[in-house]
Each structure stands twice: as structure tokens, then as C-alpha cells.
């Protein structure tokens, strides 16, 4: 990661919710296109050499491109879902805010405090030695305190490094198969747009005249295999996120109820105070 990070669970959840909604819209917009291609391909009354060329073109080109877009959307969604869920293994608080600046500050503070404890322990030992001829006193043992502080310092260091490694891992994955699929899809679409295709004379296999189509098909197959192999994990991660959003909704409702109760109490207290003030003046006063 470049610069200092600040992990905010609420922001990541909001981003997940927004992108999930947007991608659901995209998928719903693609479905009529897929259905239209299927219907035209199965239309028995649409016959003839040119008609068969069009049907083959729709099946091999349009359906491949539509499927590629769907796979890219699903792969992106899955990758982010796994990325988001993985943070709960490091910190389970639904509303966690993790600034690297704070972690590094705690680490530095622990280092300083450990040094201070060592210095203080040495001063105490020296002072006791100065009166050893008068009274024998055992110097306090600072070992356990320093050991506990060292443990805190190490835990903070490890936690910070875990986040750095985790971000680097997912950045690498994002620049891997997902990026390759998107780049191949864009290159394939660009070549079709630039060179065009004679639909009425299209023959089966002509799609591979597009130099990027074989690579795109391979990336789609790889993505499909990944989604199949991780189907169970995807389902569990989706359930986890549903539980998170349900808990956040419950917490928000509870917070609103408590806020409303506080406002009612405050309003009631103000009303009582107002009544007492009016009674104290001897009667109700008209508001002009």
C-alpha cells in the first residue's frame, strides 16, 4: 500500500452495497439482450442462408460477449465480497475504524514506555543500593510489566503487517485474472467495433478471426471454473454479509429509538420546567 491506510468498515460496506446494487442493474439490463438473442436463434420462421449466418453470429459473437460481461461482473463482485469478508478474520467489530497512523503511534509509544520503565527500574535499584547499609529492600521486578508491554507492541506490529500483506495480496489478485478478463473483453469489443463483421455472410468459427477472442474465451472459462470451485465459499460469504447488514439495520433502529426516547425525556423535562415557571408567576401567560 502506498501512503498510510485508514480502514473503515462502514465505508467498505457502503461501497459493497452501492456497487452490488449497480451491478444488479447491469445484469438485469443484459438479460433482455440474452433473451432476445436466444429467441432469434430459436425462431423457426427465420430461415435461409443469411438467416442462419445471423443466428450463428448471434450465438458465437453476441452471446459470448454478453456472457463475458456477466462473468466479469460476477467475478468482480465475488472478489470484493471475499476481500470484505476477510477483514472480519482480523477484526470482528462491525464498525471498526483502523488508521495506520494510530497503530504506528501506539507502537512508538510502547517502545518509549518500555525504555522509560527500564530507566525507572534502574533509578529505583540505584536508590535502594544507596540505603542498603541502613535497610535491605527488594527492588520491584519490572520484567513482567516490560514483557506485557512488549507483547502489546508486537501485537500491534503484527496487526499492521497483516493489513499491509492482506492489501498487497488482494491488489495482486485484482491485477490478475479479473484485470486480464476485463482487458481481453475491452480489446475484443474494440476490434469488432473497428473492423466490423459481415453478419449475413458469417460462418461458424469466424469469431476467431478476432485476434482477441481466443484469449477472451479462455479467461471466461477460467472465471467460470473459479466461481464453480468457490460456490460454497461465495454462498457463506453472502450469508455473512447479509447478517452484517441485518445487524447494522437493527443497531440503527435501536439508535433511533434511543434518540427518540432522549428527545421525549428532554421535551418532558422542558415542559415540566415551563409549567413550574408559569405556576410560580401565578398563572398562565398568553403568547403574543
Task: Give each language-model segment a name.
Residues 1-264:
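Intrinsically disordered, low-complexity charged segments of secreted bacterial virulence
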Residues 253-283, 287-288:
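Membrane-active amphipathic alpha-helices enriched in small hydrophobic residues
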